[in-house]
Amino acid sequence: MAKIYRDGDASLDWLKGKTIAVIGYGIQGRAQALNLRDSGLDVIIGARRGGNSWEAARRDGFQVYEVGEAVAKADVVMMLIPDMEQPHVWREQVAPNLRKGAVVDFAHGFNIHYKLITPPPYVDVVMVAPKGPGKAVREEFLAGRGVPALVAVYQDYSGAALKYALAIAKGIGATRAGVIETTFAEETETDLIGEQVVLVGGLMELIKKGFEVLVEMGYQPEVAYFEVLNEAKLIMDLIWQRGIYGMLNGVSDTAKYGGLTVGPRVIDDEVKEKMRRAAARVKSGEFAKEWVEEYQRGAPRLRELMEKAKNHPIEAVGAEMRKLLFGP
């Protein structure tokens, strides 16, 4: 069973009197920085001078520095810029300025796990990965709750790396909900596999294929949209709130029977085997290598695929249907 930490298992004392540099002030960086400050901790921001993040952080009342200067001032460095920007920023601005004994925190294990970033031996390297977007991290904190998180230690120079990681988790509100101990490898691989075969790739293609089948059979695109996309949220909300079995108890008997008998024929063992192959590419590092090379070329294939997704017929129909639902 997974080890789960709660509020009582963590102490902010590990961070009291220390300077925390949040590198990046996007949605996740802003949420975590504000939560840490509201928890009574000393937070500064590292950003590009004159950029949108720089100005946003100043408006929120933070002291803002160039990344290298912020790192040099910090006892704790939180790497909250996008994954693919991190290696360059690390080499040029973070690594040369790290203090001996500093704690370096990541919100995702990608760069450490796939060796795109190699930390020096004289720092702690930890991960606190909220399992929700920055907006939820902030809103739940303000409501007196928290978003669950994963926590991991990659390098324990101080002998107290886990204590520091749990303190960060507490500072952003995650221990209110619960923090699960994991490893950088497990977090990275399960995150990528989940995105590819279920959350982004799987759901997206399931919805699109269902829409295509209904339209090809002569049904109105607008009706098809509601059946395969709009109502997907209602089902996912039930699953999120009650679990799969609870969802089944929340739909009609007709939906139960149809789903339980036809679902396994559509998502069958052949699909499961394809999922295994996709997961194996993640675990071997093949996907990471492909994505890094694509990014370094300027991501031409990604742009092409995004354009294709934008031009799928479900998008035009969806734009009109969302006007009905939410207004122009």
From Swiss-Prot:
Its cofactor is Mg(2+). Residues 183-328 form the KARI C-terminal knotted domain. Mg(2+) 2 binds at residues 191, 227, 231. The active site is at 108. Pathway: Amino-acid biosynthesis; L-isoleucine biosynthesis; L-isoleucine from 2-oxobutanoate: step 2/4; Amino-acid biosynthesis; L-valine biosynthesis; L-valine from pyruvate: step 2/4. Residues 2-182 form the KARI N-terminal Rossmann domain. One of its GO terms (biological process) is isoleucine biosynthetic process. It is an enzyme of class 1 (oxidoreductase). It holds the Pfam family KARI_N. SUPFAM superfamilies: 6-phosphogluconate dehydrogenase C-terminal domain-like, NAD(P)-binding Rossmann-fold domains. Mg(2+) 1 binds at residues 191, 195. One of its GO terms (molecular function) is ketol-acid reductoisomerase activity. It catalyses: (2R)-2,3-dihydroxy-3-methylbutanoate + NADP(+) = (2S)-2-acetolactate + NADPH + H(+); (2R,3R)-2,3-dihydroxy-3-methylpentanoate + NADP(+) = (S)-2-ethyl-2-hydroxy-3-oxobutanoate + NADPH + H(+). Keywords: Amino-acid biosynthesis, Branched-chain amino acid biosynthesis, Magnesium, Metal-binding, NADP, Oxidoreductase. It comes from the Archaea. InterPro entries: 6-PGluconate_DH-like_C_sf, KARI, KARI_C, KARI_N, KARI_prok, NAD(P)-bd_dom_sf. Its EC number is 1.1.1.86. Binds 2 magnesium ions per subunit. NADP(+) binds at residues 25-28, 48, 53, 83-86, 134. HAMAP family: IlvC. Belongs to the ketol-acid reductoisomerase family. PANTHER family: KETOL-ACID REDUCTOISOMERASE, MITOCHONDRIAL. NCBIfam families: ilvC, PRK05479.1. Involved in the biosynthesis of branched-chain amino acids (BCAA). Catalyzes an alkyl-migration followed by a ketol-acid reduction of (S)-2-acetolactate (S2AL) to yield (R)-2,3-dihydroxy-isovalerate. In the isomerase reaction, S2AL is rearranged via a Mg-dependent methyl migration to produce 3-hydroxy-3-methyl-2-ketobutyrate (HMKB). In the reductase reaction, this 2-ketoacid undergoes a metal-dependent reduction by NADPH to yield (R)-2,3-dihydroxy-isovalerate. This is Ketol-acid reductoisomerase (NADP(+)). It comes from Pyrobaculum calidifontis (strain DSM 21063 / JCM 11548 / VA1). The gene is ilvC.
